[in-house]
Amino acid sequence: MDLKVTTLAGKDAGKVEVSDEIFGLDPREDILHRVVRWQLAKRQQGTHKAKGRAEIARTGAKMYRQKGTGRARHSSARAPQFRGGGKAHGPVPHSHAHDLPKKVRALGLKHALSAKAKSANLIIVDDLAIKEAKTKALVESFAKLGVTNALMIGGAEIDAGFKRAAANIPNIDVLPIQGINVYDILRRGTLVLSKAAVEALEERFK
């Protein structure tokens, strides 16, 4: 399939041929859901912690004698039922990450790209580079493209001026091709790819 290429100024820059196996699939929500869950689970810190009864700074001596008081039988005041006692089965630091096959991850990226192409929320630009690192000029360029909420993917190296100018624009993310991922694609309304990014994706999934 052929996709239209434009410049940052909104002018026509020809067309680029892309693979239907990358940009022309029927998006599957189950695949996208699995990949997003896998990504977000990996990001969780898992540092939550509550002290158990063995970790509470309190005497371990028996509270009072076993018999003769008329009260319930108790031993340590560290027990979970007491105020200030340890937490029963409380959270401990652990990783929330789970495995996901590489083929499913790759398929998820293809389906995310196809979803943007199918919904007409994919823009191909000739290059993510500007002469002057001015945020105002970049905002004007985005207005011509109709971009207000977007993920922008460039080649292996992002133009320093473009990256600096885009840093202060809300709802705009800029990543090199190595950082492309399903979650960031889906969380933004529009996906903007440079020609270098398209070529890298074609090479990656060849």
Swiss-Prot record:
The keyword Cell membrane does not apply. It comes from the Bacteria. GO terms for biological process: translation. Residues 64-76 have a biased composition (Basic residues). Keywords: Ribonucleoprotein, Ribosomal protein, RNA-binding, rRNA-binding. GO terms for cellular component: ribonucleoprotein complex; ribosome. The keyword Ribosomal protein applies. One of its GO terms (molecular function) is rRNA binding. Residues 63-98 are annotated as: Disordered. Belongs to the universal ribosomal protein uL4 family. HAMAP family: Ribosomal_uL4_B (MF_01328_B). Part of the 50S ribosomal subunit. One of the primary rRNA binding proteins, this protein initially binds near the 5'-end of the 23S rRNA. It is important during the early stages of 50S assembly. It makes multiple contacts with different domains of the 23S rRNA in the assembled 50S subunit and ribosome. Forms part of the polypeptide exit tunnel. This is Large ribosomal subunit protein uL4. The gene is rplD.
